[in-house]
Amino acid sequence: MNSKGQYPTQPTYPVQPPGNPVYPQTLHLPQAPPYTDAPPAYSELYRPSFVHPGAATVPTMSAAFPGASLYLPMAQSVAVGPLGSTIPMAYYPVGPIYPPGSAVLVEGGYDAGARFGAGATAGNIPPPPPGCPPNAAQLAVMQGANVLVTQRKGNFFMGGSDGGYTIW
């Protein structure tokens, strides 16, 4: 069959001497302190008396001319009641995200193929389905803000809003 013989053997790698590892084998972390208080009761978490009436303030937005500012300021402060040690901070209610009368821009949120009811021509924003959280536009409308929605860009390769597929 083959008169050239066998393949040459490959030399073995030299054995590495054991050295100090680059990373420590075990990482010693301080132990977390044990909990001293019991968690709050379920009824205590959802009590609607955390924010005192009149304490929540919404910053006013003013522009040089109407429609000048489409974006909201990032830092908003909402005054809450006195902080108690038994109520976790995660359960404090937050004030309105969008101040009333502000304009919120939702880019690419409008689909030209979407229909919101029989003969709907103007932009009405439907409520979220049951069990689903509202999106940014629905939150803004619920809090009295104006919503500006730009059209989603579509082309031949990315698909349109007709719901069809092309198989090559």
Curated annotation (Swiss-Prot):
User: Pfam families from the entry?
Assistant: DAZAP2
Membrane-crossing ranges are none
- Extent of Low complexity compositional bias: 1-13
For this chain the motif PPAY maps to: 39-42
Tell me where it resides.
Cytoplasm; Nucleus; Nucleus speckle; Nucleus, Nuclear body
Keywords in UniProt for this one?
Answer: Cytoplasm, Nucleus, Phosphoprotein, Ubl conjugation
Here the disulfide bonds are none
Q: Per its record, what are the GO molecular function terms? A: DNA-binding transcription factor binding; identical protein binding; mitogen-activated protein kinase kinase kinase binding; p53 binding; protein serine/threonine kinase activator activity; protein serine/threonine kinase binding; receptor tyrosine kinase binding; ubiquitin protein ligase binding
Query: Matching PANTHER family, A to Z?
Result: DAZ-ASSOCIATED PROTEIN 2 (PTHR31638:SF3)
Record's subunit section: Interacts with SOX6. Interacts with DAZ1 and DAZL. Interacts with IL17RB. May interact with FAM168B. Interacts with INCA1. Interacts with EIF4G1 and EIF4G2. Interacts (via PPAY motif) with NEDD4 (via WW domains). Interacts with transcription factor TCF4; the interaction results in localization of DAZAP2 to the nucleus. Interacts with transcription factors TCF7 and TCF7L1. Interacts with transcription factor LEF1.
Instruction: Tell me what this protein is called.
Output: DAZ-associated protein 2
Organism of provenance? Mus musculus
Q: What is the lineage of its organism?
A: Eukaryota, Metazoa, Chordata, Craniata, Vertebrata
